[in-house]
């Protein structure tokens, strides 16, 4: 019997912001009202150890919010997330790097945040740098990087410093064609480990179909359906084309 790697139970996350008021209301000194947006609404699922879950949905459906909640970046307003004592890493553009530090310094910072000690990171440093393949930029501040270079380094760190659970947000589609192929092949290599659990967010349905064991379809923060890619993806495509 497989162990459970991730349990999400009735997860709700809300964003709060100031609602815009009219000029007349401003002149009347009426208070701005707080507008609440429900990003995730009572989301529940379990993912077995070693399984690959793809999350699909239109823009704004809550996919990235889901990953950040599982990673601990966002706290639930209600509901629970249980990682069952597994280590976890989030690979997402704009998350995790100190932009003032060099790429090499960020390798160590990211590694330590993932729970690795300096010696363990040192052993993997050359492999990470070679995989990222960003040349002399590895010694320059991350703030000088293009989005493609950022993605290459982020993917290299997450893929080489292997955690129990990997969360991947759209980065398989970033970078030049050569790196896309390299990262895709690395993902296929990683998921052959029946102990590693992966959750992928992507608009590339071919990637989801080829890599994932199951697909979770989100729409406006709610789970529409969870099932096999060959069942869920045709339904989603029909929905998007209506």
Give the predicted meaning of each segment.
Residues 2-38, 230-242:
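Pre-NBD coupling/linker segments of ABC/ABC-like ATPases
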Residues 27, 108, 120-137:
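Conserved ABC ATPase "signature" region
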Residues 56-58:
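The feature captures the beta-strand-to-loop junction immediately N-terminal to the Walker
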Residues 202-203:
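H-loop/switch region of ABC-family ATPase nucleotide-binding domains
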Residues 208-210:
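A short, surface-exposed alpha-helical micro-motif characterized by mixed small hydrophobic
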Residues 220-221, 236:
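Conserved ABC ATPase "signature" C-loop
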């Amino acid at each position: 019997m497989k162990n459970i790697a991730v349990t999400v139970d009735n997860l709700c996350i809300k964003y709060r912001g100031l609602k815009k008021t009219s000029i007349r209301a401003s002149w009347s000194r009426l208070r701005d009202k707080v507008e609440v947006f429900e990003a995730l609404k009572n989301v529940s699922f379990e993912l077995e150890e070693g399984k690959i879950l793809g999350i699909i949905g239109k823009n704004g459906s809550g996919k990235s919010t889901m990953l950040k909640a599982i990673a601990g970046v966002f706290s639930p307003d209600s509901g629970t997330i249980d990682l069952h004592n597994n280590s976890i890493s989030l690979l997402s553009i704009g998350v995790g790097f100190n932009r003032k530090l060099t790429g090499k310094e960020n390798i160590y910072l990211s590694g330590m945040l993932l729970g690795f000690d300096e010696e363990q990171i040192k052993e993997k440093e050359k492999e990470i740098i070679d995989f990222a393949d960003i040349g002399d930029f590895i010694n320059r501040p991350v703030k000088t990087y293009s989005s493609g270079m950022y993605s290459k380094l982020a993917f290299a760190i997450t893929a080489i410093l292997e955690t129990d659970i990997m969360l991947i947000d759209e980065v398989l589609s970033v970078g030049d064609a050569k790196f896309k192929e390299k990262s895709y092949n690395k993902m296929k290599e990683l998921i052959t480990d029946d102990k590693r659990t992966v959750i992928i967010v992507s608009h590339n349905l071919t990637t989801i179909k080829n890599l994932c064991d199951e697909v979770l379809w989100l729409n406006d923060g709610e789970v529409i359906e969870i099932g096999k890619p060959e069942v869920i993806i045709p339904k989603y495509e029909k929905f998007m084309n209506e």
